[in-house]
Curated annotation (Swiss-Prot):
Protein's organism: Cyanoramphus forbesi (Forbes' parakeet)
Recorded GO MF terms: metal ion binding; ubiquinol-cytochrome-c reductase activity
Positions bound to heme b b566: H98, H197
Subunit details: The cytochrome bc1 complex contains 11 subunits: 3 respiratory subunits (MT-CYB, CYC1 and UQCRFS1), 2 core proteins (UQCRC1 and UQCRC2) and 6 low-molecular weight proteins (UQCRH/QCR6, UQCRB/QCR7, UQCRQ/QCR8, UQCR10/QCR9, UQCR11/QCR10 and a cleavage product of UQCRFS1). This cytochrome bc1 complex then forms a dimer.
Lineage: Eukaryota, Metazoa, Chordata, Craniata, Vertebrata
Protein name per Swiss-Prot or TrEMBL: Cytochrome b
């Protein structure tokens, strides 16, 4: 009998073991779809980004008009730009839901997979930030100025670090050039990190909603989950194209329709919606260095998840008190996102401070305590 090509060919063999004959737990739900959706987001962003880069000019005097030219004169340039800008939003929606799934079902106990995932999130955030600067509108310019300026809070080397990042004494042409270079490079770095992430995942196999070993009940990835993923792709691409065609500027900032002007400060400087929760935490602390540390901690705290797991059960599926705490945390993140979009005045200041305190308290203190309590209730 002739050997099966996909099982014997050196390259096809790798694809086969990762996407076709991969043993998968039979009971994984739609929450396990977001990994593949993130893959589609990454592919779409690289494709649209590459097409946009062919028409973009990384120069302060031409950047804004080159983006306008892409939208007006390049065939389907407006569509490519809208898909790229809104694709970033969908990327973050998917990654936040993916992290939430991992947090809820205890996937962080696969430490290597989880840690590479957190590094992926940080790289994605860096990519989105430098990308937001490229259109060189008012919010692009002032967002870059404010966020890069945060590094000046680092004792002793801060100011030197900021000037080194800027390539001068303010955000100017060298800054835009290097941000474009970084925005082009980082997605490929993300792609390589994704391969590392998947390698670690396939070492242990997928977790499942019950959080117990599924070795006795596994099914091949194809056709069962490839078809299930396809449904997810169709839903997400439908939502993305709907947003890009009907309301492309819904999630953007109107200030970015004005070319960057270093002499005029916008009334309210804020980042894109997906960074607002971290921005609210940054603003809630009056001290600059304290704010920067809280901002970093708001994301880096994810690295501590495996260490803070005190429950005898892996998932929250059968832990009602932890579930209540989880959804309180989710609501708290929505409050932080809302506060981050509001001006710095009463009552938003105190709401932001309380929500920031609640965020860290739930993750660092309440989750371990409640887990231990639930362990005692099992006795």
């Amino acid at each position: 009998m002739a050997p099966n090509m996909r099982k014997s060919h050196p390259l096809l063999k790798m694809v086969n073991s990762s996407l076709i004959d991969l043993p998968t737990p039979s009971n994984i739900s739609m929450w396990w779809n977001f990994g593949s959706l993130l893959g589609i987001c990454l592919a779409a962003q690289i494709l649209t980004g590459l097409l946009l880069a062919t028409h973009y000019t990384a120069d302060t005097s031409l950047a804004f008009s080159s983006v306008a030219n892409t939208c007006r004169n390049v065939q389907y340039g407006w569509l490519i730009r809208n898909l790229h800008a809104n694709g970033a939003s969908f990327f973050f929606i998917c990654i936040y839901l993916h992290i939430a799934r991992g947090f809820y079902y205890g996937s962080y106990l696969y430490k290597e997979t989880w840690n590479t995932g957190v590094i992926l999130l940080l790289t994605l955030m860096a990519t989105a930030f430098v990308g937001y600067v490229l259109p060189w509108g008012q919010m692009s310019f002032w967002g870059a100025t404010v966020i890069t300026n945060l590094f000046s809070a680092i004792p002793y080397i801060g100011q030197t670090l900021v000037e080194w990042a800027w390539g001068g004494f303010s955000v100017d042409n060298p800054t835009l050039t290097r941000f474009f270079a970084l925005h082009f490079l980082l997605p490929f770095m993300i792609t390589s990190l994704v391969l590392v992430h998947l390698t670690f995942l396939h070492e242990s196999g997928s977790n499942n909603p019950l959080g117990i070993s599924s070795n006795c009940d596994k099914i091949p990835f194809h056709p069962y989950f490839s078809l299930k993923d396809l449904l997810g792709f169709m839903i997400m691409l439908f939502l993305l194209t709907t947003l890009a065609l009907f309301s492309p500027n819904l999630l953007g900032d109107p200030e970015n329709f004005t070319p960057a002007n270093p002499l005029v400060t916008p009334p309210h400087i804020k980042p894109e919606w997906y960074f607002l929760f971290a921005y609210a935490i940054l603003r809630s602390i009056p001290n600059k260095l304290g704010g920067v540390l809280a901002l970093a901690a708001s994301v880096l705290i994810l690295f501590l998840s495996p260490l803070l797991h005190k429950s005898k059960q892996r998932t929250m599926a059968f832990r009602p008190i932890s579930q209540l705490l989880f959804w309180t945390l989710a609501a708290n993140l929505f409050i932080l996102t809302w506060v981050g979009s509001q001006p710095v005045e009463h009552p938003f200041i105190i709401i932001g401070q309380l929500a920031s305190l609640t965020y860290f308290t739930i993750i660092l203190i309440l989750f371990p305590i409640i887990s231990s309590l639930e362990n005692n209730l099992l006795k």
